[in-house]
Protein backbone atom coordinates (compact mmCIF):
# COMPACT_ATOMS: atom_id res chain seq x y z
CA UNK A 1 0.00 0.00 0.00
CA UNK A 2 1.19 3.49 -0.82
CA UNK A 3 2.15 5.30 2.38
CA UNK A 4 2.89 8.80 1.13
CA UNK A 5 0.62 11.63 0.00
CA UNK A 6 2.56 14.10 -2.12
CA UNK A 7 1.62 17.79 -1.86
CA UNK A 8 1.87 19.47 -5.28
CA UNK A 9 0.70 23.04 -4.59
CA UNK A 10 -0.93 25.36 -2.06
CA UNK A 11 -4.17 27.28 -2.13
CA UNK A 12 -4.72 30.29 0.10
CA UNK A 13 -8.12 31.09 1.56
CA UNK A 14 -9.15 33.85 3.93
CA UNK A 15 -8.36 31.92 7.11
CA UNK A 16 -6.83 28.72 5.78
CA UNK A 17 -3.96 27.32 3.79
CA UNK A 18 -4.73 24.21 1.77
CA UNK A 19 -1.95 21.84 0.73
CA UNK A 20 -3.27 20.36 -2.52
CA UNK A 21 -2.10 16.79 -2.92
CA UNK A 22 -2.20 14.40 -5.82
CA UNK A 23 -5.11 11.98 -5.79
CA UNK A 24 -4.47 8.79 -3.94
CA UNK A 25 -5.88 5.31 -3.44
CA UNK A 26 -5.72 5.91 0.31
CA UNK A 27 -9.09 6.14 2.06
CA UNK A 28 -8.69 9.64 3.46
CA UNK A 29 -11.89 9.47 5.52
CA UNK A 30 -10.33 6.69 7.60
CA UNK A 31 -7.26 8.75 8.53
CA UNK A 32 -6.64 10.76 11.67
CA UNK A 33 -3.98 13.33 12.51
CA UNK A 34 -1.00 12.22 14.60
CA UNK A 35 0.17 15.78 15.44
CA UNK A 36 3.72 14.79 14.55
CA UNK A 37 6.12 15.86 11.79
CA UNK A 38 9.31 14.23 10.54
CA UNK A 39 11.99 15.54 8.18
CA UNK A 40 12.84 14.03 4.79
CA UNK A 41 16.32 15.45 4.18
CA UNK A 42 16.74 13.66 0.85
CA UNK A 43 13.63 15.26 -0.66
CA UNK A 44 13.73 18.57 1.26
CA UNK A 45 10.30 17.93 2.76
CA UNK A 46 8.44 17.90 6.02
CA UNK A 47 6.38 14.74 6.57
CA UNK A 48 3.16 15.19 8.54
CA UNK A 49 1.98 11.86 9.93
CA UNK A 50 -1.57 10.60 9.54
CA UNK A 51 -2.71 7.17 10.64
CA UNK A 52 -5.47 4.64 10.22
CA UNK A 53 -6.05 1.38 12.08
CA UNK A 54 -3.22 -0.43 10.35
CA UNK A 55 -0.58 2.03 9.15
CA UNK A 56 0.98 5.46 9.06
CA UNK A 57 0.56 7.74 6.05
CA UNK A 58 2.99 10.59 5.42
CA UNK A 59 1.87 13.91 3.92
CA UNK A 60 5.00 15.14 2.15
CA UNK A 61 5.19 18.96 2.18
CA UNK A 62 8.06 19.92 -0.17
CA UNK A 63 10.30 22.95 0.18
CA UNK A 64 8.41 24.61 -2.69
CA UNK A 65 5.46 25.03 -0.30
CA UNK A 66 7.41 26.23 2.73
CA UNK A 67 7.12 29.98 2.13
CA UNK A 68 3.32 29.77 2.06
CA UNK A 69 3.42 27.53 5.15
CA UNK A 70 5.71 29.96 6.98
CA UNK A 71 3.37 32.86 6.17
CA UNK A 72 0.39 30.82 7.43
CA UNK A 73 2.28 29.97 10.61
CA UNK A 74 3.11 33.64 11.23
CA UNK A 75 -0.55 34.59 10.79
CA UNK A 76 -1.97 31.67 12.82
CA UNK A 77 -3.82 30.38 9.77
CA UNK A 78 -5.28 26.87 9.97
CA UNK A 79 -3.60 24.42 7.57
CA UNK A 80 -5.28 21.54 5.77
CA UNK A 81 -4.37 18.90 3.22
CA UNK A 82 -6.78 18.17 0.37
CA UNK A 83 -6.70 14.66 -1.07
CA UNK A 84 -9.40 13.22 -3.34
CA UNK A 85 -11.50 16.38 -2.71
CA UNK A 86 -11.47 15.73 1.05
CA UNK A 87 -9.86 18.28 3.37
CA UNK A 88 -8.26 17.30 6.66
CA UNK A 89 -6.80 19.70 9.22
CA UNK A 90 -3.11 19.17 9.92
CA UNK A 91 -3.42 19.68 13.67
CA UNK A 92 -0.27 20.81 15.46
CA UNK A 93 1.64 21.42 12.23
CA UNK A 94 2.77 24.91 13.26
CA UNK A 95 4.16 23.81 16.62
CA UNK A 96 5.87 20.75 15.17
CA UNK A 97 7.56 22.71 12.36
CA UNK A 98 8.66 25.44 14.79
CA UNK A 99 10.27 22.76 16.97
CA UNK A 100 11.99 21.16 13.98
CA UNK A 101 13.28 24.51 12.69
CA UNK A 102 14.93 25.13 16.07
CA UNK A 103 16.63 21.73 15.87
CA UNK A 104 17.62 22.05 12.21
CA UNK A 105 19.22 25.50 12.50
CA UNK A 106 22.97 25.03 12.05
CA UNK A 107 22.70 21.25 12.56
CA UNK A 108 24.76 19.43 9.92
CA UNK A 109 23.13 16.11 10.86
CA UNK A 110 20.19 17.09 8.64
CA UNK A 111 22.42 17.70 5.63
CA UNK A 112 23.69 21.03 4.36
CA UNK A 113 21.04 21.35 1.65
CA UNK A 114 18.13 20.95 4.07
CA UNK A 115 19.67 23.24 6.69
CA UNK A 116 20.20 25.94 4.06
CA UNK A 117 16.65 25.59 2.71
CA UNK A 118 15.07 25.73 6.19
CA UNK A 119 17.18 28.70 7.31
CA UNK A 120 16.37 30.59 4.10
CA UNK A 121 12.61 30.28 4.58
CA UNK A 122 12.05 30.11 8.33
CA UNK A 123 14.86 32.18 9.87
Swiss-Prot record:
<comment type="similarity">
    <text>Belongs to the UPF0738 family.</text>
</comment>
<protein>
    <recommendedName>
        <fullName>UPF0738 protein BC_1197</fullName>
    </recommendedName>
</protein>
<dbReference type="Pfam" id="PF19785">
    <property type="entry name" value="UPF0738"/>
</dbReference>
<dbReference type="InterPro" id="IPR020908">
    <property type="entry name" value="UPF0738"/>
</dbReference>
